[in-house]
Amino acid sequence: MKTFIALLAFVTSICQANVERFSITSKIIDETTTVRVSLPDTYTHSSSFSYPLLIVLDGATQFPHVAASTQFLSTYAILPEMVVVGVSTHKRLQYFTPTEHEEFVGRSGQASAFKGYLHKELLPSLKSKYRIAPYYVISGHSMGGLFTSYLALQNENEFNAHIAISPSLWWDEKTLMDTYLSTEQLTQPKRWFLSMANEPGEMNDSYIAMLDALKKKPVKNLHWFSQRFNGETHDSTPLVGNAQALKSLFHNWNAVPEVDVMSLQQLQVFYQHISGEYGYNFPLSAHQYNVYGLKAAYEGKTAWGVEILEQGVKHFAQSEILWDSLATAYNLDNKPVKALSASKQALQLAKTNDSIYLHEITSQNNQLMSKVESLNGVESL
C-alpha cells in the first residue's frame, strides 16, 4: 500500500484545537455553568458547513482529551468532524441521577432537570453561536455515564448517540435496567456505548446485568455497543474509553478503511446508505474530501481524486489543505499547470491564515514552479 506522504504532513499539529469559553446562568438547575468549546480545525474553511455536536460531561477533566481524540480521528475520516463542548455541574449526584434515593433525599433524582438544561438552555445557546448540525453525541463517566445511559432510553431526547464510560448503573437497585426492560422501542435511531474498567462489586455486577438485558431483549431503533477495559481503573478508563467509544459508534464511518478507493458518486451512495442507521444524512466534510481525494489519487485513480478534491474546494473554498491536495492530485494526473494554479491558491490562503502547514505548502509550490518552468523551457527549444 502506498504511503500518503502529503496526507501525513497535515496531521502533525491537529490537536491544537481552537478553544472558546463562555458561561450560562441557568434558570433550570440554579447554577452558572462554564462551557468550553473546541471548534474543528476546518471551521473557518467554510462559512456555511455545519458540524455535529459532542457534549462532554465533567468537562473540567474530560474535555481536553476527548477534544484531542476527536480532532485526531476525524482527520483520518474515522469519525465526523465535530464541535466538542465540555460542561460541568457542581452537583453531580443531584443532576446525574434519574431517581431520588432514600439515603440522598433532596440531593438526588433530578436528572430530568439537567436534561432540561441541556435541551432548553445549552443546545439553543450553542446553536445561536456556532454552526451546529442536528446530530448530537453526549459522553459521561461514572455518574455522568449513568446520566447518558438514562438519556439513551428517553424518547423525548434530542441526542442521537450516547457514551457511558464505567456508568454507575447500580444506582437505586439498578433502576435504569427496569427502565430498559419496560421500553419496547425508541421513536428515532439511537446509539449507546457502554464500557467497564477493571472494577469490582456493584459497578461490575450492574454492568453485566445490563448487558444481559440488552442481549435478551432488543429494543427497536437502539444500536448498542460495549467493551471491557481490563487494563484500566475507574479513573484511567475515560482516556482510552472515549476514543474507543467514538470509533465504535462510528465503526462503519470510513468509506475506504483499507486499500480500496471510491469515486465521488460511490462515496455519496455509501453515506446515503448508512444514513438510516444513524438517523441523519451527513454531508462530506473537508477532511473527508481530503482523505478520499488524496487516497484515490495516490492509488492510481487520479481522475477520481481530482473530482473529489475539486468538489471539496467548491464547498470549502478557504481550505489551504484542500487546495494543496488538489495541486497534488493535478500533478499526479499530469496536469502541472493546473497543479501550480491550485498550489498558488493554497499558498495565498496559508499566508493569510498563518497556517501551520505553510512550510509544506510552500515546498510543493516551489517544486511545481520549477516543474512548470522546466516544461516551458523545453517547449521553447
What are the residue ranges of the model-derived segments?
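Hydrophobic h-region of N-terminal signal peptides that target proteins for export
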Residues: I5-A17
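A ubiquitous, low-specificity "background" feature that marks scattered single residues
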Residues: L8-A9, P64, S380
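Intrinsic disorder/low-complexity segments in short proteins, especially the signal peptide
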Residues: T12-S13, E373, S380
